[in-house]
Amino acid sequence: MRSQLYTGLVLASALVVASPAAAFGQTRSFDVAAQSASTGIVAFARQAGIQIIAPEDATRGRRIVAIRGNLAITDGLRRIATASGLRLVSFDGRTAVLATGAVAASQVSQTDPATPVGVQPETQQASNELDEIVVTGTRARGQTVLTSSSAVTVATREDLDRKAPRSTAQALELIPGVFVEGSGGEVSNNFSVRGLAGGGQQFVQLQEDGLPVFYINALSDTILKQEVSIDRLEAVRSGSSGILTVNGAGATVNFITRKPDFDKSGGTFQLTTSSFGTARVDAFMTKPIAENTAISIGGFYRKDDGIRDPGYDANHGFIFRGAIAQRWTGGKLTLSAKVVDDSNIFYVGIPLTGVGDPKSIPGLSATHGLLQSRDFSLVRTRTSPTTGRSFQPIDLEDGVHTKAQSYGYDLTQDIGSDFNFFARGRYTNFGTDFNSIFSYDNSGLGLASDRLANNPTSAQTLARFVPQGANKLGLRYVDTGQVITGTAALNAINGNGLIAESVIGRNRASVKEFNSDTGITWQTPTNSLTLGGLFTRSSRYNDAIGTATFLTDVQDRARRVDVVALNAANNVVGSLTENGFLTYGTFGEGPSRAKFSSISAYATDQLTLWDKLRIDGGARFEHFVFNRLAGETINRAPIAGSGTYDANGNLLVDNDNIIANNYINNSFAGTYTAQRREFNKVAWTLGANYLITPRLAVYGRYATGFQAQEQNTPTNLRFAEGGVRYSSGFLQASVTGFYTKFLDYPQSRDITSTVGGVQITQQLTANSGIKVYGGEFDVTLRPTTWFRLQASGVIQDSSISIGELIARRNGVVVDLNTIDPALRATVQGFGGNRPERTPALNINVTPAIVLPNNLGEIYGSWKRIGKIYADVSNSLELPAYSVFSAGVLFRLDEAVSLSASVENIGNVIGLTEGNPRGGFVENTGQNTYFARPINGRNAVASVRFDF
């Protein structure tokens, strides 16, 4: 009967030849995925070279967390016991015994270091986040969150499943101190860290398996998606973040993928549906193909209508990845490849009403509506012949279409017992067509009747066509030709009477980039020293050829309208717009080509004293060279065939009586300006962690960092932080106070006006700084076996300081005194304001009822975002909001699990940004405005099969 009791576990490998005492402290390299306890214990035993004995019924229905990295065998056994809820009865250095239930201290081997003195067995039975081994932001082996001297967050696969992020950016909400504007859909979302102004993705470096997706973190989330091939997320804020990676001074977020398994075949197959028409399949499979060789493949395919449905497939495409790994004594090499062909809709700001209390406009839902529609999903816009074409096709149904391939390697090799050499690198070939619309200036949103009666351009249009008999203006729908005129009829359009200017465009970008990290670590029982180098070489192309401003009504799935001149019989005799297009070349046509390289040398060292004090420091020297050829533009160029022009380009005869197709604004001149930036800079950090007891630690850190800004001057940063961490089965808590100073952080806005028919763009750049004081917390409370409460967030106070002002007119530096004095005074008054789109409060609370026998959990989520300001002037306040969500994770057995989540149950209208193209001051005094709300109520459900 005893043989049956321990059936299936575990004579997985040869016995350790070394003495038991040596085995206790022996460090090995582990790569064990999160999985069922019955298979995971086998895999761990094989890699540790020991026996593990446990009753089969004790492991049934239990799971272990991922165990990866270099750590002592006893530390690995602790993690298995902690995560699975088992207890470690004994370990003599060769054989470990696991069982269920409580155990007296006298029953555990007196030589067993797996149970620290003073720690009761029951305190180890719950998964402990602070005991997670981290590899991001450190080179020390076996580094845990508890003993780290940086602000570290680890999110396991289960944490990601519980979060059920609708985008990669939403996964970052698991990190305290990071504010995510997840309202843009799957891609191109904005996020910021520790009080930095929102908008963009600066100062946060997204990594995949320890390497940057891109050196300049833009559109990384088009090829880094949430999928079952992702094993976990690790994040480091400030501190060592700017040492061990490039352009990540504020934070490094590392998504770590599942690796080939040398010990067993297995994988995951997952089917997903949603309330917005998702049909998705995810898969991952790994298989050993020889004793020391293993492969894995994975990826997903999906399509859906989008939470905001444009009337066509919003998201469609796939990612496919594969890897092959070879191991040998003391070393391993993994070769990987990934292919992306994916299209995504990009959600932009929509018209809303109610400043300070946002509400839907009649006909356009703030939670589920959008302007995109089939009416203008496939159009052609006019371009200058100097671009190589006269028309640019724009396909919104193709969306943000990304095609990319990446190829990587990851090599580790032990050299003797104390040294480890590592080399990892990745080449990425990336291309995207960013087909989308964008909100325009807030002044372009208003009543149709007001625009026709009071807009200066409208008056000019009517005067232009008086010789043709025009006596009034009206609107004409492009799709049907219906003409609407008269104040009453115009005010009745869609029940709101509004029309809006938007911009449509197709931004093309391509990137060919290689990133690598190579170094050597010298590890002793009390010290870990790493010397390494980072290298990047990148070639980029970008253009916005074909952008155009157009007019629509305001409704869900809007329709284009023309502004037309009418005669007494209501016949059209002329038009301001062409098929709804008001102007061409809105964002300029100039293409750009850039090449840059970055070479960094870094050193990090961690010294351990008295087994309690860890002192670490690091420095990185970077040599950066950036060269760009930026296409030059001219103010406007005549469109051939539209009319007769004089030698100066002035229109003499309009062939078709359409004003919009006479000229292209900001047209490509066919020439380029050379831009260059070269710098040598050093980032450094010093930190310490003191383990007061096995459960309680304090830490502190100071760091300097910098961020490359392409051809612009790099931004310098300063960080200081200190915190306390506590870890037990009842409570895991990490509380951090921080100070951040962003130096020479430029903020620029364009102000465009028309003088004498000539468009003039005035740009005012403030070389400002930002100071932030704040506190972060990450707490998990487990008062009983069936209840868990997690809370994380940040409370911060950030303010702007204004330095030198630089004025430009149409791109040329001019005397500051030539700029409107009122504008200058206003900008100088921004000092002391809060940075735009930066909340003072950002909190997430997640209570969960844990089902017995490891069946799963039922959880809720409350997110609170404090008020933010849409602009640097703090003139438009976007109010605070709370979002409630809920979900369930349920395991039918070890192989089959179900998950479902409902996001924004209350259908709350929460605004993440105003109108980023609205200038310094967005509040125009109107009650209607552009803003981007979070998505409304939606649900996602999956069934997962592990094998």
Where would I find each of the regions flagged by the language model?
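Gram-negative outer-membrane beta-barrel transporters
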Residues: Q110, V119, Q124, A766-V872, ...
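Short acidic/polar hinge/loop motifs at secondary-structure boundaries
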Residues: L211-R237
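Extracytoplasmic beta-strand/coil segments of soluble accessory domains associated
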Residues: A96-A99, T136-T144, S149-V152, A169-L211, ...
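C-terminal beta-signal and adjacent terminal beta-strands/loops
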Residues: L743-D744, W786, V794, S798, ...
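Short, acidic, small-residue-rich periplasmic hinge/interaction motif at the N-terminus
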Residues: I41-A48, T100-D161
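Outer-membrane beta-barrel translocator/receptor signature
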Residues: G25, Q202-F203, F214-I216, S229-R232, ...
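Structural signature of Gram-negative outer-membrane beta-barrels, strongest in the C-terminal barrel
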Residues: V511-E513, Q523-A569, G590-F742, R782, ...
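Acidic/polar loop-and-plug regions of large Gram-negative outer-membrane beta-barrel proteins
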Residues: F320, A325-R327, K332-G408, D433-V511, ...
